[in-house]
Amino acid sequence: MDVTITQLENYLSNHYSGRATEQSMFMKLIEEIGEVAELLNKRAGRKASDGSDLTLELGTELADVIHYAVAIAAINGIDMNDIIIRKDKTASIKYQHKINLETFIKQQALA
């Protein structure tokens, strides 16, 4: 099953509506980023690992990062689809990318 950003925003807006603040979501986001950093250190050998599947754990923690980042947007009524497309257009020009995200998506739809 694929999940769109809009679906995730709607779900998280519904889930956190009236019961979470952007500050509490931000603190959770920072905690999860710390867990990603710890896993990256384990993968690089800078920190001991218990032999578990670090790739799976990394994916799980990255999902948590996405969850809380999108939750902050959702409780503030920010349309991340629009923001991501606009931000990528700006970055594509700034960093001289051959193609931007919007064009890529349109080309994929035609293929």
Regions found by a protein language model. Give the residues of each.
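Flexible "arm" and connector segments at domain edges
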Residues: 1-62, 66-111
